[in-house]
UniProtKB/Swiss-Prot annotation:
Belongs to the XK family. The gene is Xkr5. Its main location: membrane. It is a multi-pass membrane protein. This is XK-related protein 5. Pfam families: XK-related (PF09815). The lineage of its organism: Eukaryota, Metazoa, Chordata, Craniata, Vertebrata. One of its GO terms (cellular component) is plasma membrane. Keywords: Cell membrane, Membrane, Transmembrane, Transmembrane helix. The chain crosses the membrane at residues 37-57, 114-134, 140-160, 206-226, 239-259, 266-286, 294-314. Residues 336-362, 372-391, 495-538, 598-661 are annotated as: Disordered.
Amino acid sequence: MHAGLLGLSALLQAAEQSARLCSIVFYFATGRLLWGWLALSVLLPGFLVQALSFLWFRADGHQGQWWLAVLHLLQLGVWKRHWDSVATALWKGKEAPSWGQLHLQEADLSALRLLEALLQTGPHLLLQAYVFLASDFTDIVPGISALLSWSSLSWALVSYNRFLGIMKPGHHTMLWAALLCQQLWRMGMLGARVLSLVLFCRVYRVWVLVVGGAHWLVMTFWLVAQQSDIVESTCHWRLFNLLVGAVFILCYINFWDSPSRSRVASFYLVMLLENSILLLLATDFLQGVPGTSLWTVVGVLSGFLIGCASLVIYYSLLHPKSSDIQQSFMRKCCGPIEDNKPESEPPPRAVDPTGEMPDSSSWCQEESYELTSLDKAPSPEQNTAEVGLGEQRSGESSFFSHHHWLLLKLALKTGSVSRINAALGGDSPGCSCPPLLGSSQHCDLQRKPLFSHQDLPSSPCDPLTLEKGSEYVGAPKAEMESLETSSYLSFASELEDNATTQKPPATQEDSPKLAGSKADLAAQGKETEGPLQGKEGQESTTLYFSAAMDRTTSHQRGSPVVLRISHSETLVESRPGQPALPQAVTKPFPVTVANISPIPGRNFRPSAELPGRAPDSSECEEWKDAARDPSMQSSLPKMRLKAAEEPCFTSTPKSESIQRDYSCRDRVRQEMSFFI
């Protein structure tokens, strides 16, 4: 089937280009120089397609660039791709690499052929249809050229749609009936649009440019409102919308991954209204219409009806997901339908009569071949853990800048790497996702939890124990891209308060810092030993600290961060009935982070049973003693408190006793820096 479709495409393209050359010769031979030069100028946009084809050949690593350049200068670059695809389909068996190579060649050929048809065949079709209609259907050469251009442009759209199905994982082979139905759909819609524009241009001349420009602007704004994510760059995204808006003057192409029923219906409804208005204006509301104009009106209406009927038949009967489309349409029209079956069975896969449909496992191998063959084949040493980060980044950048990456985004109708990975890796259990799509350091960082149970100290008697908290696992990638989790760590507590804040995602440069912070936590947490000693009271004290994990600093053993705690105050657990903990031994603080600020907890107040100290002054004297200690000032780094205009929002409520102590603590904050 591949060879037959490629042969049909080549035959149709050869006939269309031959008729184009014959029409140019015909115009110059009959003295119609204006039409001859206009038909000749239509060939100029083809050089853009040839230049793009040559660049793609170079990106694929083809040798003999000098003769490739000559072929493309002679407008034969697309023909070279036709020859390569037919040769691959006929002479190279059905091995997985051969099928993968054939799919890549067909993808390149379909994309370039569609671009060539839109830039060359579309304008040539409008020109030849106008000449044929202006001659009252008497000039045979422009009529034949217009007919072949019409068929060639329609087949280019069908081939592009088939290419989209080939590039998708677990694709279904299209039957000949589906291809024929798509051809009728495209020919009907294109014929109605071209005839209405040509008939209006025949009467109002240049005003057809106003109609086309207005339609272009409306379609461009509609595309902007749809927010396609195929192109990431802002400048390229705007250019993409402008170009697709120009394409929508003649035909519709889907660039969105969501269901397109409403978009297709809206587009063709607008086209029907525009065509009807243009016909009514061109024929003076069907009063005194000549015979040629009347036949043109009949052709427009019949073409639109044939296109609509073919469109409905294709999506209801011949589409690979036709059963799902029917069920969705019935649910939308008639509400939910009760089914006796517990689960809806998937639609049967369309089987080609020749039996050339690859199964899902073979397709996974082909897709893996397609994407991994874009760069150099990795050596056995590179498959081990010794692969450097620089090599991964270079392979990533080379793949993301390759033209096959653009074709893959067009096929899956999305530019999101996570969605492309999910589509390629979730097709079947045995499908091996290409490593280049899954080796993004940024994605790995998002999927990696910030803390694990092994990294945190787990001793229940440690004075500064970081209890096992909730890990950030199972979070969707879309949420992890916009959310960053900061932990509020409790001393001598079994609870960990997590607050989720809206922050930009961590960059790739911050990932070594995160890894270093985790290593410091694991190493220093094991060294921290020694129980706290104190008395059990009715009221307990819990100290909360906020750690900004995106700005961690490496901790040096030579300059430990010491937490000075008064012996007269007890740090006990918030739960009632907890036995008294022994006295704490001064040890290095296991969490070495910058910008640590004390956050008062629910029970953060001095103990009522502490003798020899007033309840209102115990906390103030403790911090003042820490500030006056010269040995502590020389050995500890100074860490400023956060500014008053930048409060730290926490999920920890504040008790009424804390508010009574604010005046004393505010005076301390103005006199000293905070030491840990």
